[in-house]
Amino acid sequence: MASSLVSSFQPRSAFLGDRNVFKVSSTPFAQVGYSSKTIECKESRIGKQPIAVPSNVTIALEGQDLKVKGPLGELALTYPREVELTKEESGFLRVKKTVETRRANQMHGLFRTLTDNMVVGVSKGFEKKLILVGVGYRATVDGKELVLNLGFSHPVKMQIPDSLKVKVEENTRITVSGYDKSEIGQFAATVRKWRPPEPYKGKGVKYSDEIVRRKEGKAGKKK
């Protein structure tokens, strides 16, 4: 009886089978900070894309400092040490990682996008459109000020930066344009912030491509 029990006993590893096998990835890993953990450093799909430079755009690179000049204006950007910018013989720009870390991977895609926005901005420009929805809501441009009537007891006056152009059509359609995409977005967001669109009647300031999720009022729920 004892011998049969001994013969039927098997180590735990025999029951686990393939679960004891550890698979090792061939993808390179990098150490992060002082942590004992390792992470997989994946290549950024956005970061590895080349940047085309039009003939009317001038690129000046000194160390980690980049200056881009075009017919619409001039922009500057300083790169972190985790990434660097190189110019190929073909004329394309490439953003490359200098180290293999999680932060470098994040900076890779981010600074490729920022650099591309600079090149497009000084050559073609960007614009952002807003729409005023509401009875009595209107906008006008008075010199270097955007004047908004949004139902408050007094009009809202916003100073227009020198690098931006603001145009108003039909008193309710605002177009903000310029060569600095981040500045355009910030100015447009400030305009919208004065009266964000409310979900019941849709009144407020919204982006032209914004979809406002509508809610049913209390009166509609009782029916």
From Swiss-Prot:
One of its GO terms (biological process) is embryo development ending in seed dormancy. It is found in: Plastid, Chloroplast. It comes from the Eukaryota. Pfam families: Ribosomal_L6. Coiled coil: none annotated. One of its GO terms (molecular function) is structural constituent of ribosome. Residues 1-41 form a transit peptide. One of its GO terms (cellular component) is chloroplast envelope. Keywords: Chloroplast, Plastid, Ribonucleoprotein, Ribosomal protein, RNA-binding, rRNA-binding, Transit peptide. HAMAP family: Ribosomal_uL6_B. Belongs to the universal ribosomal protein uL6 family. This protein binds directly to 23S ribosomal RNA and is located at the aminoacyl-tRNA binding site of the peptidyltransferase center. Part of the 50S ribosomal subunit. This is Large ribosomal subunit protein uL6c. It comes from Arabidopsis thaliana (Mouse-ear cress).
